[in-house]
Amino acid sequence: MKTFVLHIFIFALVAFASASRDSAKKIGSQYDNYATCLAEHSLTEDDIFSIGEVSSGQHKTNHEDTELHKNGCVMQCLLEKDGLMSGADYDEEKIREDYIKETGAQPGDQRIEALNACMQETKDMEDKCDKSLLLVACVLAAEAVLADSNEGA
């Protein structure tokens, strides 16, 4: 019994450490063009919001509009370089395909429904940088809510 409890504890610790590590990562840092997009916008990694900050919405209250816009421009750069966006226009089908490939989501998955809702919510925005950050923030917030609801289930 003690061994079983120890295994449960270790599993929980690893899961918590993994989630903490992911939330500390910078948004977009997993993409190949991350350094290029930072350089194109004269930013450093210190200027970019963390995944945890964005998924919790803290980025909106802890930073000025210019910081929000600059982070959005890096996100737009990444989306454009990956062929998912051109200017302020999404390629919704490519975004969906890329998201499914990255997350392993299956048809009917709530994460895909959340992605679709986020694209719908932001599709009419004209500023490409603000639009990109809002899309990323919307998806990260939805994923956090879904993860929390799945843990409680």
UniProtKB/Swiss-Prot annotation:
Entry keywords, A to Z: Behavior, Disulfide bond, Pheromone response, Pheromone-binding, Secreted, Signal, Transport
GO terms assigned for molecular function: pheromone binding
InterPro entries, A to Z: PBP/GOBP (IPR006170), PBP_GOBP_sf (IPR036728), Pheromone-bd_protein_Gp-9 (IPR022354)
Record-annotated disulphide pairs: C37-C77, C73-C129, C118-C138
Signal peptide residues on this chain, from the entry's feature table: 1-19
Classification via SUPFAM superfamilies: Insect pheromone/odorant-binding proteins
Pfam families: PBP_GOBP
GO cellular component labels: extracellular space
Top-level taxonomic group: Eukaryota
Gene Ontology BP term (one): response to pheromone
Subcellular location, record wording: Secreted
Assembly: Homodimer.
Function: Colony queen number, a major feature of social organization, is associated with worker genotype for Gp-9. Colonies are headed by either a single reproductive queen (monogyne form) or multiple queens (polygyne form). Differences in worker Gp-9 genotypes between social forms may cause differences in workers' abilities to recognize queens and regulate their numbers.
Family according to the record: Belongs to the PBP/GOBP family.
Official protein name in the record: Pheromone-binding protein Gp-9
Lineage of the species this protein comes from: Eukaryota, Metazoa, Ecdysozoa, Arthropoda, Hexapoda
